[in-house]
Amino acid sequence: MVTKTLSIVFVASEVDGLIKSGGLADVAKALPKSLKELGHSVQIVMPAYKTIAGRDDAEIILTTQLEHWPHTAYQVRSLSIDGISVFAIESGDYFERAEMYAENNQAYADNGERFAFFSAATLDLLPKLLNKKPDIIHVNDWHTGLIPYLLKKRYAENEFYHQTRSVLSIHNAVFKGIFHYDEIACLSEFKSHFVPEASISHTHVSMLKAGVQCADKINAVSPNYAKELLTELGSHGMASDFQDRESDLIGILNGCDYSEWNPEKDSYIPKQFKVNRISMVRGKKACKAALQQEVSLPQKDVAMYGMVCRLTNQKGIQYLLPILEQFLKNDLQLVIVGTGDPVLAARLTEIAQEHSDKFAFIEAYDNKLAHWVEAGSDFFIMPSEFEPCGLNQIYSMAYGTLPIVREVGGLKDSVNNYDDDIENATGFSFKNPEPMELLLVLMRSLLLYSQNLNEVKRVQLHAMKQDFCWNKAALKYIEMYRTTINS
């Protein structure tokens, strides 16, 4: 039996390699690439932000009109990433701006209208550009949540989309795309102020809710996050919507881009190393010494803890700060790299000044330094409040750095806790969002390091052998696509 090649349109608000603000962009680059490598037809649709429209390789291939819209004209630019065609929708009114979503920490006032337009234009352009009808339109987060709704309503009788099915990926349900009806009234379906699939009140709608209600299949970026979305806490108030669609909700853990995060080929780190004990021990020792020198910590062979994150409560800084000085009384070193909340940054700066022989805080995001922290640390701290998937724990394991995580979202799916399964352990974990629980697991890791360094090296090597490649994740997506098409 010949397996049908699928035609997939992947729609996202950002794509790594073109423009990026977070993990969505990583997925929007890596998953289509893997789907193509597995033999499927893939196109990407995204907005043509200012930096994209200005690229020399972004050729205008279509100038057209979007009916029933105040600003009807738009253009489509064509470019390529990893051999995949990208259609970038250009409209000076909406995307010719300095940033994607906000300036000076203020969201653009017309974000609702901007991404309503983007959703409508996406469905308008595909029949004009594609020779083959799409089997799947895969949309991501609230920015594209109206696409499944429009497919069900506006395009229900459209011959081009008659066999097309939609998949919505939830990367972070905190962001729901909530807007007043008037902000997206350019869509004729919303002029009446009565769209039950999207309404959260008499005056406001959620674009994410519209997608959850109308997509043929819903995907969370880890199996455990899919379970959390069924709870009020995990869904941030949308539990009933996800519960209504529970039979169509599936969790697939994101993959890792090993072309960038691979200690054997990493051009950033001072010494590359392979997945064998001798190479790992020598490589990590050299990387630790270089990291110590880079952040002005003493050259000592002590347990090195690393953390690279945004300084927000989501990342669990509020659990670390109350116990940090107590933890630093021990013989260890800690490097934290990140930017974000100025109050949290000020407190970390203060503690670093008081413990300059043990703790370095770098208030910046530096990709090279992030690689150095992953390679030079023995342990990586991720005490997240919530973490739909998480990637740093996967990067850490690739570099033989043991993640210390809270058991939420994808962290629970990807890290095997030492105290639960010593033989198959790849890190340490704790359950409850409490500073003392974090301190206990930190001390547990430090005790193992000080008493049985050989065991730490064994676990580090086992962690390096884990495989989270994107092609494995892509196979699960293909299975989901086929189930969606056949259901």
Curated annotation (Swiss-Prot):
This is Glycogen synthase. Transmembrane segments: none annotated. Pathway: Glycan biosynthesis; glycogen biosynthesis. One of its GO terms (cellular component) is cytosol. Pfam families: Glyco_transf_5, Glycos_transf_1. It catalyses: [(1->4)-alpha-D-glucosyl](n) + ADP-alpha-D-glucose = [(1->4)-alpha-D-glucosyl](n+1) + ADP + H(+). Gene3D superfamilies: Glycogen Phosphorylase B (3.40.50.2000). Keywords: Glycogen biosynthesis, Glycosyltransferase, Transferase. The gene is glgA. Its EC number is 2.4.1.21.
